[in-house]
Amino acid sequence: MTAEEIKKKDSEYIMHTYGRFDIVLDQGKGATLWDADGKQYVDLTSGIGVNSLGHGNPAIVNAVTKQAEKLMHASNL
């Protein structure tokens, strides 16, 4: 999907409870992000997990992958 297609679906299906940046992020590594057009950003706005661990930390990716292979989700209901 193109960035414009993603933005259109976002406006149709996502409740906008807070302001958003007008970008479509594609990938991240450490504190660096890239949008769907390949433009690079330094991530100064993400949540606490990214602030302390960075995007794409190999140890975290490995741990999450291993856990997801065993159990993806367990409801507390």
Q: Can you say where each PLM-predicted feature lies in the sequence?
A:
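Active-site-adjacent loop/helix segments that line or gate small-molecule/cofactor pockets in enzymes
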Residues: M1-K29
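Short hydrophobic/aromatic-rich motifs at helix boundaries and adjacent loops
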Residues: T2-A3, T32-D37, N57-A63
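Generic structural "secondary-structure junction" signal
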Residues: H16, R20, Q27, D35, ...
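Active-site and channel-lining beta-strand-loop segments
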Residues: I23-D43
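Glycine-rich loop-to-alpha-helix module at the N-terminal edge of alpha/beta enzyme cores
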Residues: Q40-L77
